[in-house]
Amino acid sequence: MAASVRHLLKPWTPSLCLMRWSRYNPYYLDPEPRKDAPVSDSELSPEQKELQELKTVRPIKAALTGDTSSAFSDPLISKFINMMMYDGNKVLARGIMTQTLETIKRKQVEKYHKSPAAKREEIECNPYAIFHQAMENCKPVIGLASIQKGGKFYQVPVPLTDNRRRFMAMKWMITECRTNKQGRTLMYEKLSQELLAAFANEGNVIKRKHDLHKMAEANRAYAHYRWW
């Protein structure tokens, strides 16, 4: 009797599945914490209508602790804050990020008003767009892996996953801001400078990415060692 009841409730109850560290089976739908403006059924695409109907009959996963319905939340910025956090002080890391975005906004608005009218449209004043583009410019395309062959280690060029590329870009940015500050420059001031430089494809982080690409190009003779 218990086995038959469990068989009936199987799609609705969390159970073991092939996905690592997952409490839910694939029958569960992902949550949507963002509460955007409602859209009429006539404006929805067939795929959106089908997903809307599935939400009425299929269970939804529990939202993550860091999820929020705020219009100012950004997954990429949240990841950057978590990486910048030191000794568990997330309030400080979040405050630094807020001051950084505010500083970028002030600098860009000042630049906007000082520029002639013909060039104002080329100036980006949205700090979120600047942050995203700066991170995209800092992402390396290819990396190096240490592989042993015949008792000797070789630096072999290997392709990078999207998560690894994002991690390296954020790590380089944070390391640059912590180690190369001049005098008593505050963290948010240095971070805003580096983000604006990376947005323009300039700065030490962009140089570090290019150096990595040059090393990968120099070691391309060892590329066949990737299939070890």
UniProtKB/Swiss-Prot annotation:
Q: Which SUPFAM superfamilies does this UniProt record tie to the protein?
A: Ribosomal protein S7
Keywords, alphabetical: Mitochondrion, Ribonucleoprotein, Ribosomal protein, Transit peptide
Would the keyword Ribosomal protein be found if you checked this record's keyword annotation? yes
Stored CDD domains: uS7_Mitochondria_Mammalian
Superkingdom is: Eukaryota
Tell me the subunit arrangement. Answer: Component of the mitochondrial ribosome small subunit (28S) which comprises a 12S rRNA and about 30 distinct proteins.
* Name recorded for this polypeptide: Small ribosomal subunit protein uS7m
Q: Which organism is it from?
A: Danio rerio
Gene this protein is translated from = mrps7
